[in-house]
Amino acid sequence: MSSLTYLKKYELPPLPYNLDALEPYISKEIIDVHYNGHHRGYVNGANSFVDRVNKILKGEISSGQYDIQGLLRGLVFNINGHKLHSLYWQNMAPAGKGGGKPGGVIGDLIEKQYGSFEKFKALFTEAANSLPGTGWTVLYYEVENGNLQIMTFENHFQNHIAELPILLILDEFEHAYYLQYKNKRADYVNNWWNLVNWDFADKKLQQYMKK
Protein backbone atom coordinates (compact mmCIF):
# COMPACT_ATOMS: atom_id res chain seq x y z
CA MET A 1 0.00 0.00 0.00
CA SER A 2 1.49 3.35 -1.06
CA SER A 3 2.00 6.03 1.56
CA LEU A 4 -0.19 9.12 1.48
CA THR A 5 1.38 12.25 0.00
CA TYR A 6 -1.47 14.60 0.99
CA LEU A 7 -2.05 17.90 -0.82
CA LYS A 8 1.00 19.58 -2.28
CA LYS A 9 1.70 23.28 -1.83
CA TYR A 10 1.73 25.96 -4.51
CA GLU A 11 4.61 28.19 -5.59
CA LEU A 12 4.70 31.72 -6.96
CA PRO A 13 5.97 31.46 -10.56
CA PRO A 14 8.60 33.93 -11.74
CA LEU A 15 7.30 36.99 -13.53
CA PRO A 16 8.09 36.52 -17.26
CA TYR A 17 9.44 40.08 -17.62
CA ASN A 18 10.76 42.97 -15.54
CA LEU A 19 8.41 44.96 -13.33
CA ASP A 20 8.60 47.96 -15.67
CA ALA A 21 8.26 45.97 -18.91
CA LEU A 22 4.59 46.79 -19.44
CA GLU A 23 4.95 50.55 -19.18
CA PRO A 24 3.47 52.93 -20.19
CA TYR A 25 0.29 50.83 -20.34
CA ILE A 26 0.65 49.29 -16.88
CA SER A 27 3.02 50.97 -14.45
CA LYS A 28 5.91 49.37 -12.59
CA GLU A 29 4.22 50.27 -9.30
CA ILE A 30 1.06 48.36 -10.23
CA ILE A 31 2.95 45.26 -11.36
CA ASP A 32 5.04 45.30 -8.18
CA VAL A 33 2.01 45.51 -5.89
CA HIS A 34 -0.05 43.15 -8.04
CA TYR A 35 2.58 40.43 -8.35
CA ASN A 36 4.53 40.68 -5.10
CA GLY A 37 1.51 41.61 -3.02
CA HIS A 38 -1.73 40.21 -4.38
CA HIS A 39 -0.53 37.17 -6.35
CA ARG A 40 1.86 36.18 -3.59
CA GLY A 41 -1.03 36.58 -1.18
CA TYR A 42 -3.12 34.07 -3.13
CA VAL A 43 -0.27 31.57 -3.09
CA ASN A 44 0.21 32.01 0.66
CA GLY A 45 -3.55 31.82 1.20
CA ALA A 46 -3.86 28.63 -0.82
CA ASN A 47 -1.01 27.03 1.10
CA SER A 48 -2.59 28.01 4.40
CA PHE A 49 -5.78 26.18 3.42
CA VAL A 50 -3.73 23.24 2.10
CA ASP A 51 -2.10 22.96 5.54
CA ARG A 52 -5.52 22.85 7.20
CA VAL A 53 -6.84 20.21 4.81
CA ASN A 54 -3.74 18.09 5.37
CA LYS A 55 -4.21 18.32 9.14
CA ILE A 56 -7.77 17.07 8.68
CA LEU A 57 -6.55 14.18 6.52
CA LYS A 58 -3.94 13.32 9.13
CA GLY A 59 -6.54 13.34 11.89
CA GLU A 60 -4.99 16.32 13.67
CA ILE A 61 -8.27 18.25 13.34
CA SER A 62 -11.45 16.32 13.98
CA SER A 63 -14.94 16.76 12.56
CA GLY A 64 -16.79 19.62 14.19
CA GLN A 65 -13.63 21.69 14.61
CA TYR A 66 -13.82 23.25 11.16
CA ASP A 67 -16.32 24.68 8.67
CA ILE A 68 -16.01 22.46 5.59
CA GLN A 69 -17.87 24.89 3.29
CA GLY A 70 -15.77 27.81 4.42
CA LEU A 71 -12.63 25.73 4.07
CA LEU A 72 -13.42 24.62 0.52
CA ARG A 73 -14.55 28.10 -0.50
CA GLY A 74 -11.33 29.64 0.76
CA LEU A 75 -9.24 26.96 -0.90
CA VAL A 76 -10.95 27.39 -4.29
CA PHE A 77 -10.80 31.20 -4.09
CA ASN A 78 -7.07 31.27 -3.45
CA ILE A 79 -6.14 28.49 -5.89
CA ASN A 80 -8.13 30.15 -8.66
CA GLY A 81 -6.60 33.51 -7.78
CA HIS A 82 -3.13 32.00 -8.09
CA LYS A 83 -3.75 30.12 -11.33
CA LEU A 84 -5.62 32.93 -13.07
CA HIS A 85 -2.90 35.43 -12.20
CA SER A 86 -0.26 33.04 -13.53
CA LEU A 87 -2.12 33.01 -16.86
CA TYR A 88 -2.60 36.78 -16.79
CA TRP A 89 1.15 37.44 -16.58
CA GLN A 90 1.91 35.04 -19.42
CA ASN A 91 -0.89 36.49 -21.51
CA MET A 92 0.92 39.82 -21.77
CA ALA A 93 4.16 40.77 -23.48
CA PRO A 94 6.40 43.81 -22.94
CA ALA A 95 5.34 46.98 -24.70
CA GLY A 96 6.34 46.79 -28.36
CA LYS A 97 6.28 42.99 -28.41
CA GLY A 98 2.58 42.45 -27.79
CA GLY A 99 -0.69 43.72 -29.17
CA GLY A 100 -1.67 44.13 -32.79
CA LYS A 101 -3.67 41.60 -34.77
CA PRO A 102 -3.23 37.91 -34.03
CA GLY A 103 -1.77 35.55 -36.58
CA GLY A 104 -1.51 31.79 -36.62
CA VAL A 105 -4.35 29.42 -35.82
CA ILE A 106 -6.01 31.76 -33.35
CA GLY A 107 -6.07 34.58 -35.87
CA ASP A 108 -7.71 32.35 -38.46
CA LEU A 109 -10.29 31.04 -35.97
CA ILE A 110 -11.18 34.55 -34.80
CA GLU A 111 -11.68 35.67 -38.41
CA LYS A 112 -13.77 32.60 -39.18
CA GLN A 113 -16.00 32.81 -36.12
CA TYR A 114 -16.35 36.57 -35.62
CA GLY A 115 -15.92 37.84 -39.18
CA SER A 116 -12.96 40.05 -38.34
CA PHE A 117 -10.54 40.76 -35.54
CA GLU A 118 -12.08 44.21 -35.15
CA LYS A 119 -15.51 42.70 -34.44
CA PHE A 120 -14.03 40.25 -31.94
CA LYS A 121 -12.07 43.00 -30.19
CA ALA A 122 -15.16 45.19 -29.94
CA LEU A 123 -17.23 42.36 -28.46
CA PHE A 124 -14.54 41.35 -25.95
CA THR A 125 -14.09 44.99 -24.93
CA GLU A 126 -17.84 45.45 -24.53
CA ALA A 127 -17.98 42.37 -22.32
CA ALA A 128 -15.07 43.63 -20.21
CA ASN A 129 -16.58 47.08 -19.76
CA SER A 130 -19.95 45.60 -18.79
CA LEU A 131 -18.55 43.46 -15.97
CA PRO A 132 -20.19 44.58 -12.70
CA GLY A 133 -17.80 44.96 -9.81
CA THR A 134 -14.55 43.02 -9.96
CA GLY A 135 -13.57 39.86 -11.79
CA TRP A 136 -12.22 38.61 -15.10
CA THR A 137 -13.00 38.63 -18.80
CA VAL A 138 -11.68 35.62 -20.71
CA LEU A 139 -11.62 34.01 -24.12
CA TYR A 140 -11.61 30.25 -23.89
CA TYR A 141 -11.72 27.36 -26.32
CA GLU A 142 -14.58 24.89 -26.16
CA VAL A 143 -12.91 21.57 -26.81
CA GLU A 144 -16.23 19.81 -27.49
CA ASN A 145 -17.28 21.89 -30.50
CA GLY A 146 -14.26 24.03 -31.35
CA ASN A 147 -15.91 27.36 -30.49
CA LEU A 148 -14.18 30.40 -29.06
CA GLN A 149 -16.24 31.73 -26.15
CA ILE A 150 -16.05 35.10 -24.41
CA MET A 151 -17.04 34.95 -20.76
CA THR A 152 -16.99 37.22 -17.73
CA PHE A 153 -17.14 36.11 -14.12
CA GLU A 154 -17.07 37.97 -10.85
CA ASN A 155 -14.28 37.31 -8.38
CA HIS A 156 -12.93 33.75 -8.60
CA PHE A 157 -15.00 31.63 -6.29
CA GLN A 158 -16.26 29.32 -9.03
CA ASN A 159 -15.04 25.74 -8.76
CA HIS A 160 -12.35 24.83 -11.29
CA ILE A 161 -12.81 28.03 -13.29
CA ALA A 162 -9.02 28.21 -13.67
CA GLU A 163 -9.00 24.83 -15.42
CA LEU A 164 -10.97 26.14 -18.42
CA PRO A 165 -9.02 26.15 -21.72
CA ILE A 166 -8.33 29.90 -21.35
CA LEU A 167 -6.59 31.69 -24.23
CA LEU A 168 -6.95 35.34 -23.20
CA ILE A 169 -7.54 36.68 -19.73
CA LEU A 170 -8.06 40.22 -18.47
CA ASP A 171 -7.87 40.98 -14.75
CA GLU A 172 -10.50 43.53 -13.75
CA PHE A 173 -9.91 43.65 -10.03
CA GLU A 174 -9.16 47.23 -8.98
CA HIS A 175 -5.64 46.29 -7.92
CA ALA A 176 -4.86 45.60 -11.60
CA TYR A 177 -5.35 49.22 -12.67
CA TYR A 178 -6.52 51.66 -9.98
CA LEU A 179 -3.12 53.12 -8.99
CA GLN A 180 -2.71 54.33 -12.57
CA TYR A 181 -6.18 54.64 -14.08
CA LYS A 182 -8.24 55.42 -10.97
CA ASN A 183 -11.93 54.93 -11.86
CA LYS A 184 -11.31 54.90 -15.64
CA ARG A 185 -11.36 51.13 -16.07
CA ALA A 186 -12.29 51.43 -19.75
CA ASP A 187 -8.96 53.17 -20.43
CA TYR A 188 -7.12 50.26 -18.80
CA VAL A 189 -9.10 47.78 -20.91
CA ASN A 190 -8.30 49.67 -24.11
CA ASN A 191 -4.60 49.92 -23.30
CA TRP A 192 -4.39 46.24 -22.33
CA TRP A 193 -4.84 45.35 -26.01
CA ASN A 194 -1.37 46.79 -26.64
CA LEU A 195 0.12 44.09 -24.40
CA VAL A 196 -1.71 40.93 -25.49
CA ASN A 197 0.73 38.10 -26.12
CA TRP A 198 -0.86 36.50 -29.18
CA ASP A 199 1.98 34.00 -29.60
CA PHE A 200 1.21 32.59 -26.15
CA ALA A 201 -2.53 32.49 -26.89
CA ASP A 202 -1.90 30.72 -30.20
CA LYS A 203 0.30 28.08 -28.57
CA LYS A 204 -2.34 27.46 -25.90
CA LEU A 205 -5.03 27.08 -28.56
CA GLN A 206 -2.99 24.55 -30.52
CA GLN A 207 -2.38 22.55 -27.34
CA TYR A 208 -6.10 22.41 -26.58
CA MET A 209 -6.94 21.46 -30.16
CA LYS A 210 -4.83 18.34 -29.83
CA LYS A 211 -6.86 17.07 -26.87
UniProtKB/Swiss-Prot annotation:
Homology family: Belongs to the iron/manganese superoxide dismutase family.
Molecular functions (GO terms): metal ion binding; superoxide dismutase activity
Keywords noted in UniProt: Iron, Metal-binding, Oxidoreductase
InterPro entries documented for this protein: Fe/Mn_Superoxide_Dismutase (IPR050265), Mn/Fe_SOD (IPR001189), Mn/Fe_SOD_BS (IPR019833), Mn/Fe_SOD_C (IPR019832), Mn/Fe_SOD_N (IPR019831), Mn/Fe_SOD_N_sf (IPR036324), SOD_C_sf (IPR036314)
EC number(s) stated in the UniProt entry for this protein: 1.15.1.1
Cofactor list: Fe cation
Gene source species: Acidianus ambivalens
EC class (word): oxidoreductase
Keyword Oxidoreductase: yes
Protein name per UniProt: Superoxide dismutase [Fe]
PROSITE patterns: SOD_MN (PS00088)
Gene3D superfamilies: Fe,Mn superoxide dismutase (SOD) domain, Iron/manganese superoxide dismutase, C-terminal domain
Taxonomic classification: Archaea, Thermoproteota, Thermoprotei, Sulfolobales, Sulfolobaceae
Reaction equation(s) it catalyzes: 2 superoxide + 2 H(+) = H2O2 + O2
Cofactor note (record): Binds 1 Fe cation per subunit.
